[in-house]
């Protein structure tokens, strides 16, 4: 019994998974992208507006140009597993942020196991995973707000080692 018991408060967990499809225009393509996210997550997606006008892309301020959905719990882990399978369980080192979150993109949503529908088309999407530890709520709650100490904050190294261990995955340097 020389091994020390792991503190359960130090275990990393997936707080949420955000799926985003940025279409770049409002209208029919945006509603079709919304259907894709609804099929994948079983939740109603939210439309995102452009922050400012970009004339070269033909985007106006406050025009709806993207859809996203936030998934939590076991469903988030299941969708993330399908996304990582498409990426062959390989992510680059720069996919991980300094705060311990990570993200990646896929080119075709049909790789996730969704049946191709010619009326919808094919969309790529971004996966973004927010990681935390138990006790992170103290920074966000309304009453008795507190801070998380530096030793308990999620770091890039913690997330990379968790990712390698949980998914038996590779993190490439380049």
Curated annotation (Swiss-Prot):
Q: Which InterPro entries is this protein grouped with?
A: Ribosomal_uL5, Ribosomal_uL5_C, Ribosomal_uL5_CS, Ribosomal_uL5_dom_sf, Ribosomal_uL5_N
What are the alphabetically sorted keywords of the record? Acetylation, Cytoplasm, Methylation, Nucleus, Ribonucleoprotein, Ribosomal protein, RNA-binding, rRNA-binding
- What are the recorded Gene Ontology BP terms? cytoplasmic translation; ribosomal large subunit assembly; translation
| Superkingdom | Eukaryota
Residue positions where N-acetylserine is found in the record: 2
GO CC annotations?
cytosol; cytosolic large ribosomal subunit; nucleus
A family per Pfam: Ribosomal_L5
Principal location: cytoplasm
Post-translational modification, as annotated: N-terminally acetylated by acetyltransferase NatA.
Record's subcellular location: Cytoplasm; Nucleus
N6,N6,N6-trimethyllysine PTM sites in chain numbering = 75
Please provide, alphabetically and separated by semicolons, the GO molecular function terms listed in this UniProt record: RNA binding; rRNA binding; structural constituent of ribosome
The record's Gene3D superfamilies line, in alphabetical order, gives: 3.30.1440.10
Other facts: Present with 21200 molecules/cell in log phase SD medium. There are 2 genes for uL5 in yeast.
Q: Which family does it belong to?
A: Belongs to the universal ribosomal protein uL5 family.
Q: What does this protein do?
A: Component of the ribosome, a large ribonucleoprotein complex responsible for the synthesis of proteins in the cell. The small ribosomal subunit (SSU) binds messenger RNAs (mRNAs) and translates the encoded message by selecting cognate aminoacyl-transfer RNA (tRNA) molecules. The large subunit (LSU) contains the ribosomal catalytic site termed the peptidyl transferase center (PTC), which catalyzes the formation of peptide bonds, thereby polymerizing the amino acids delivered by tRNAs into a polypeptide chain.
Q: How does it assemble?
A: Component of the large ribosomal subunit (LSU). Mature yeast ribosomes consist of a small (40S) and a large (60S) subunit. The 40S small subunit contains 1 molecule of ribosomal RNA (18S rRNA) and 33 different proteins (encoded by 57 genes). The large 60S subunit contains 3 rRNA molecules (25S, 5.8S and 5S rRNA) and 46 different proteins (encoded by 81 genes). Component of a hexameric 5S RNP precursor complex, composed of 5S RNA, RRS1, RPF2, RPL5, RPL11A/RPL11B and SYO1; this complex acts as a precursor for ribosome assembly.
Name of the protein in its database record: Large ribosomal subunit protein uL5B
Which organism encodes this protein? Saccharomyces cerevisiae (strain ATCC 204508 / S288c) (Baker's yeast)
């Amino acid at each position: 019994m020389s091994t020390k018991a792991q503190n359960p408060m130090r275990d990393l967990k997936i707080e949420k998974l955000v799926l985003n499809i940025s279409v770049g225009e409002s209208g029919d393509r945006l509603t079709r992208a919304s259907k894709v996210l609804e099929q994948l997550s079983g939740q109603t997606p939210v439309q995102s507006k452009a922050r400012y006008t970009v004339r070269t892309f033909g985007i106006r301020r406050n025009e709806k140009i993207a859809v996203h959905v936030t998934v939590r719990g076991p469903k988030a882990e299941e969708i993330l597993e399908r996304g990582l399978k498409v990426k062959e369980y390989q992510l680059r080192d720069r996919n991980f942020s300094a705060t311990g979150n990570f993200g990646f993109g896929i080119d075709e949503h049909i790789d996730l196991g969704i049946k191709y529908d010619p009326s919808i088309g094919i969309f790529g999407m971004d996966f973004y995973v927010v990681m935390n530890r138990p006790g992170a709520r103290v920074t966000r709650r309304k009453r008795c707000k507190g801070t998380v100490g530096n030793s308990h904050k999620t770091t890039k190294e913690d997330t990379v080692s968790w990712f390698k261990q949980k998914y038996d995955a590779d993190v490439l340097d380049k």
